Amino acid sequence: MASSVRAPSGSVIAVASSSSSAALAGVCGTGSPCAACKFLRRKCQPDCVFAPYFPPDNPQKFVRVHRVFGASNVTKLMNEIHPLQREDAMNSLAYEADMRIRDPVYGCVGVISILQHNLRQLQQDLARAKYELSKYQAAAAASASTAPTGPQAMAEFIGSAMPNGAAHNFINLGHSAALGSLGGSTAMFGQQEQFGSNAQMLSRSYDGGEPIARIGMNNGGYEFGYSSATTMGGSAGAVSGGLGTLGISSPPFLKSGTAGGDEKPSGGY
């Protein structure tokens, strides 16, 4: 019962009796019993273990759990686990019960097997893709490390740009030209060396070791003279012999090769 008490300010305060409080306590916090108590047709107590996990707006959740596992087994399980783990446990029981109703033989095990098979297939595909990628990366690294640089790259570029045989002929031509140039230089050096030895032979003295003839290397000039008047005859013969050694016939007069030089008569004329 409820009684009213008049306050000093004139307002009325209603006070509920103990019987009314007990009646309100039998109803859940939302004003209606939970899905478990409603399905079991019992009074929902304030400490009902099903009320937090089986709300009245989803009655089929408890119906499936009760059908597969039983309300007594669910109550026993909830009393054995920690209160913080009860929500996950009730959601797991609800999922397993739903899968068992859909597939009475395998239940959730069949779904788990399918998911595991898909996971293994994806792992194999990923490993295969990584293997193919590693092969491409290794080939790219090998080609980059063995790529020709400098003269070798230029030679390969010339060889690829020229027709077949053209590069070989080009190399042979350059080799022949180099040998010809080297041979010409050698021949010229040999001629100069032979001319120098003949000049030394001509400048050798035939009268007491004194030089009586000299051929100038500049402008191809030459000079001729005697060491003394008494030996002119013998010296002329010696010089004539020296010119014969060079393969040059004795002219009637020998002239100086330098510009503006005086003419010197031969000893024999």
From Swiss-Prot:
The keyword Nucleus applies. It is found in: Nucleus. InterPro entries: LOB (IPR004883). Keywords: Developmental protein, Nucleus. The keyword Metal-binding does not apply. GO terms for cellular component: nucleus. It holds the Pfam family LOB. Expressed in leaves, leaf primordia, immature ears, immature tassels, whole ovules, silk and husk leaves. Residues 32-133 form the LOB domain. Belongs to the LOB domain-containing protein family. Might be partially redundant with the LBD6/AS2/IG1 gene. This is Protein IAL1.
